[in-house]
Curated annotation (Swiss-Prot):
Subunit note: Component of the RIX1 complex, composed of ipi1, rix1/ipi2 and ipi3 in a 1:2:2 stoichiometry. The complex interacts (via rix1) with mdn1 (via its hexameric AAA ATPase ring) and the pre-60S ribosome particles.
One Pfam family cited in the UniProt record for this chain: Ipi1_N
SUPFAM superfamilies linked to this entry: ARM repeat
Gene Ontology BP terms: rRNA processing
GO cellular component: nucleus; rixosome complex
Basic residues: compositionally biased ranges: 1-10
InterPro entries attached to this UniProt entry: ARM-like, ARM-type_fold, Ipi1_N
Keyword rRNA processing recorded: yes
Protein name (Swiss-Prot/TrEMBL): Pre-rRNA-processing protein ipi1
Compartment list: Nucleus
Amino acid sequence: MGASTKRKKEKQKDFQKPKLKVGKAKAKPDNFTDTSFKSKAITLNQQSLTLTAPSANTQFSHHLSLLSSKSDSQRRDSLAHLTTTLTSQPTHLPPPQPVSVILPSLLPLILDSNASVRANLLKLLRALPQHDVKDHVGTLMPYIRAGMTHLAAEVRVSSVEVLGWLVSIAGDEVVGVAGGWVKTLNCFLSVLGWHVAAKSKWTSLATSTSTSASGSGNGTGSSTSGKASYGKAGAKGRPQVRFLTILADFLDAGIGSSGSQSMDTTADSASESENQYCTFPITTFASHLIPSNFASPYLTLNLFGTPRDEEGEMYETREDRWRVFVARGFLGAVERGLETARGEGGEVGRVSALAAKVLRNARDDLEGDGFGDEL
């Protein structure tokens, strides 16, 4: 009983208010720490001053490796860091890593399922040096075409935006690279819901109807055969406007007046030179030199590559692109699709009229020179 009474008294002490005596300070707790001291320096255990902070190149490479992370937020933040690094440095300085090292990590993100990742990817692509990107158009185009035919409508919209950026800085390279003309046109028709009538050995009502509807010289293009999906329901036609705008830019780069590599550009520039007779008897000396404005001037010969079909061929001149554009029925399909879009009116109708103007000017220039007579 004595021990039990003692324990009860000890417990009651916790709830009893101590009586303070006048003139005496309050008792300090057991865990009290005196902080009234003053010191000029604080010494930490295991402190090392030999380690240096990571350089900008190291941080850039680290965030570049994080682009393959499974976390959406990690990929988004890494893209934002890379974009900030590229935009903050002076324009005359090269990026911390070459574009040939940066692009392989960026290309798979064109097909990323996260919208914020794709948006940050487009910002990063626009921050890359334009003259360096032109040499890697052949690597970019397969991923862009894969995104344009993706099942998700949002990925298709983002891929077309990437194509619009690439056409704006390297339009000649986009339409002149292997598969850059025919395959990209097929992707555009797929995105917009315009289809070229396929040639079949079997007679059918649909085939005969589409064939009879096509005009001479315009191929066997058929009209729109299905409602295309342009992303979210609240977009109100804005993706379609962007698609048609980028299609107009793509056609202008390929067959429009801004198209490069006409057949006689090299000869004309050489003949107009004031020093054309300095290398007599060779008056067109520049035409005998290796082109210096191309990274791979003989890539079109495909000397060591696999054989290409008509879709994967390189069409370097404006005339060659116009021939295949008419022969494969793209002209008829695009004209009918633009006519349908023009009937919708509004912004869609205005943009479709611009694309139709590009076709009309190309027809007047090229068919007037006799490039469409033999088809």
